[in-house]
Amino acid sequence: MGAMSPWHWAIVALVVVILFGSKKLPDAARGLGRSLRIFKSEVKEMQNDNSTPAPTAQSAPPPQSAPAELPVADTTTAPVTPPAPVQPQSQHTEPKSA
């Protein structure tokens, strides 16, 4: 009773065709295949990276002489003063006394 019968699969397939349309299904399947292929190659590459031993310190090239110091640009700037805040003008006018 818990397993999917062929009728269940047919209904699921019909719903998928109705939702995505028969024209988009081949493109979706192609994209899914490409994604799986890329995923498999990345997993395989990660496994190969883990299986190769890390290079030892003895095989590292000898250190080169210290690089010459580069001139440092002057990063100081003049202080910037912020503009004065603008006071909002009143929209209504008070009646003038006579």
From Swiss-Prot:
Biased composition range(s): Low complexity: 66-79
Main location: membrane
Transmembrane segments: 1-21
A GO cellular component entry from the record: TAT protein transport complex
Sequence segments annotated as region (Disordered): 43-98
Molecular functions (GO terms): protein transmembrane transporter activity
An annotated GO BP: protein transport by the Tat complex
Keywords: Cell membrane, Membrane, Protein transport, Translocation, Transmembrane, Transmembrane helix, Transport
Membrane protein topology class: Single-pass membrane protein
InterPro entries linked: TatA/B/E (IPR003369), TatA/E (IPR006312)
Subcellular compartments: Cell membrane
Keyword Mitochondrion: no
Pfam families hit by this protein: TatA_B_E
Keyword set includes Transmembrane helix: yes
Family membership: Belongs to the TatA/E family.
Assembly description: The Tat system comprises two distinct complexes: a TatABC complex, containing multiple copies of TatA, TatB and TatC subunits, and a separate TatA complex, containing only TatA subunits. Substrates initially bind to the TatABC complex, which probably triggers association of the separate TatA complex to form the active translocon.
Function, as annotated: Part of the twin-arginine translocation (Tat) system that transports large folded proteins containing a characteristic twin-arginine motif in their signal peptide across membranes. TatA could form the protein-conducting channel of the Tat system.
The protein, known as: Sec-independent protein translocase protein TatA
Source organism (scientific name): Rhodococcus erythropolis
